[in-house]
UniProtKB/Swiss-Prot annotation:
The modification Cysteine amide is found at residue 62. Has the structural arrangement of an alpha-helix connected to antiparallel beta-sheets by disulfide bonds (CS-alpha/beta). SMART domains: Knot1 (SM00505). This is Alpha-toxin Tf4. The keyword Disulfide bond applies. InterPro entries: LCN-type_CS_alpha_beta_dom (IPR044062), Scorpion_toxin-like (IPR003614), Scorpion_toxin-like_sf (IPR036574), Scorpion_toxinL (IPR018218), Scorpion_toxinL/defensin (IPR002061). It is found in: Secreted. The keyword Coiled coil does not apply. It comes from Tityus fasciolatus (Central Brazilian scorpion).
Length: 62
């Protein structure tokens, strides 16, 4: 798998600015990642499937 900042439907990072502990781990697992954490201020996932969309600075429109 791959790792990175999971992208939402707009291609933006998933914020964890105001979220509780464990939020990013849950969000990442919903995207079939093995785990995740809050790399403040955005979620970062490990073990994402290759098909998962991740934030890319080259295509960032956020």
């Amino acid at each position: 798998g791959k790792e990175g900042y999971p992208a939402d439907s707009k291609g933006c990072k998933v914020t964890c600015f105001f979220t509780g502990v464990g939020y990013c781990d849950t969000e990442c697992k919903l995207k079939k990642a093995s785990s995740g954490y809050c790399a403040w201020p955005a979620c970062y996932c490990y073990g994402l499937p290759d098909s998962a969309s991740v934030w890319d600075s080259a295509t960032n429109k956020c």
